[in-house]
Structures are given as structure tokens and as C-alpha cells.
Amino acid sequence: MNKKTIRDVEVRGKRVFCRVDFNVPMEQGAITDDTRIRAALPTIRYLIEHGAKVILASHLGRPKGKVVEELRLDAVAKRLGELLERPVAKTNEAVGDEVKAAVDRLNEGDVLLLENVRFYPGEEKNDPELAKAFAELADLYVNDAFGAAHRAHASTEGIAHYLPAVAGFLMEKELEVLGKALSNPDRPFTAIIGGAKVKDKIGVIDNLLEKVDNLIIGGGLAYTFVKALGHDVGKSLLEEDKIELAKSFMEKAKEKGVRFYMPVDVVVADRFANDANTKVVAIDAIPSDWEALDIGPKTRELYRDVIRQSKLVVWNGPMGVFEMEAFAHGTKAIAEALAEAPDTYSVIGGGDSAAAVEKFGLADKMDHISTGGGASLEFMEGKQLPGVVALEDK
């Protein structure tokens, strides 16, 4: 990675504005999953141990530039304090006199969490005035919020124009793992692309076809490819306007010598419900009034074999409607194959795939789970991420 990190700069005695991603799921004011808070701990601990005055900033949810009481970060500050085993001060604003006074009170090794930055309309607009106000609080900017790196916001990109800007450890790890996968992968390199819609994965499929040895397709988006081969898909998810594109992807795979794997059998249901009637049918035998909601057992076995033979697997998107028990078997089989394959380095591309490995209790068996759904997707599309571009080069 050619970006400076906190290791490359002196932090002792400095006021460090550290953008983290504490956008955690909440229910009735309680945090239901603190993974994102834990992910930022190495950077925060490093700053504390090296005598920085730590100012943390994050968003939570989508308050749309207004104060939304249930999206305040008080519960986050409390949980962070428990994890760090030290008090974490919190302000009720993210800029202004109260914040300046709180920053002035910080000693070396102290931690202050600012209020939700998305309470300010200028955050998502990347307003230079707000970015300057953030920058005035500090001597150094650290971005450790890979999950928000694809957004050019005031606290992720704008602020970096006014302060020396470096990466935190989580940002560094994400860029190294994903960067190596795209630029210098161990082979055979397999990408597994699932999820509901082709349109969300066009850029990823297009970019990965230049790089992978095997491409595995599953989830709702698979049926547009099945239709492109001339098979009837019944009531399965179908994007009519993407059929030609699906054909062109299969052509491109052939030209590039990429092995393109699609379901050979599927689990179909007579309606979209966990207690629907289901059966397994061959891919060219989907009944006209049924819909395919998961990959079938033969496909699971086929995909498992490909995974076992791969040195690197990047997985983005589930194989079926894994939220429903009846249609979770395909996604679970992929997660288990990745967990069990001894020589396979597994990179889980955030979002639903990350949620799935968590759900099946296999998260600790994965080599790298990306903390950014949208960010990792855009990175795998080959796009430049504004929050990364803004950091200083080594």
C-alpha cells in the first residue's frame, strides 16, 4: 500500500481527528453487534499508547442532516469505553464551542467521541466550511473508516485538504488485502458473485473477468444468466434489460479463458415464504409458476469443489434468500466450504456475505471480512475511493 499510515507520523501530544466507522446496528437504543467498534480498536489503542489526544468522529444511520435523537452516539461511547477499559468523553455536537472546549481539555492518551457527523447537512455535501471546522480541531487527520471511503464527505475527504492525512490500521489492512487480490492474486483465483441484482454487480463482474481464473454466479442475479442461455426461469428474479449484458459477460469469460460456473440445479418454491412448498429441479426445468430461491445440492457440491481447488476466493453476495431457513443452504454451503478449505485464503466482501458468515457462526474461520459493503464493491470495480485518494502518499 503506497499511502502513509499512523506509523509514518509523530502523534505524541498531537490532536488527532480520527474518522472511524461506528455505524453499528441498534435496537431500542442498544447496540446489537459491535463488530465495527472492535475493528477500530487497534488504531485507537495505538493512538492512546503513543500519547495522542484522540478525537473520534463517525456517522450512524441516515439522519439526513438533522438531529435524530435515537441516532446519537451515546451508546457507542459507552460501549467503546467498556472495550478500551477507560472513560470515553462525548460531546453533543461535532463542531462548535462545546467541542472546542472539550478538545482543549484533552490530555495525552484521552479519547473524545464527537456527535454523529451526519446531523450536519454539510457532511454528505462535502461542505468545505464544515471540513475546515473539523480540521481546526486537530493537528493530524487519520481515516480508519474503510466502510465510508467510497463517499466524498466532509469527514472522509474534505477534511484531508486542510490537515496532514494518513490511514489507520483497519484502512491499511483493507487496502492491502483487497489490493493484493486485484493486483497480484494467488492462483487459482475464484470470485463468487451473488445477491439479487445484476445491475448492482455489473462493474464488479466486468473488472473481475480481467483477473480471475473462475467466476461463480449465484443468488437472484443468476437467473438473468440462466435466461440468457435460453432456459425458462418461471417466476424467479429476472432483469429483462440485462439479458444481453449477461450474454456478453459469458462471451467475455470465454475469450479470457475464465471458467464461468452457474447453477446446475436450484431449489424452487411455489411462493416467496419460508413455509412454501419447495422442490429441487434441474436448471432447465424450473416450473413456470414457481420461483428459484436457492442453489440446489449438485450446485453446492460443484461450487465446493471449485473453492477447494482455489488459493484465493473473493465472495460478494449470497447464493439464495439466506434470511429464510428453507433457502439458506446454498449460502451456508459456500461459507462452510471457505471455512474448511485448508489452502484457500478467503476474502468476504462485506454487506450480506459478511452477515451470512456471522449468522452461520463461521466469521472467525474467514481470513478477511471486509468492513465495507459498498466500499469493497467499488474497490473491486477498480474505482478510486475518494477517502483513500485524499490520504498522503508514502
From Swiss-Prot:
GO terms for molecular function: ADP binding; ATP binding; phosphoglycerate kinase activity. It is an enzyme of class 2 (transferase). One of its GO terms (cellular component) is cytosol. The keyword Hydrolase does not apply. Substrate binds at D21, F22, N23, R36, H59, L60, G61, R62, R118, R151. PROSITE patterns: PGLYCERATE_KINASE. Its main location: cytoplasm. It comes from Geobacillus kaustophilus (strain HTA426). ATP binds at K201, E323, G350, G351, D352, S353. The modification Phosphoserine is found at S183. This is Phosphoglycerate kinase.
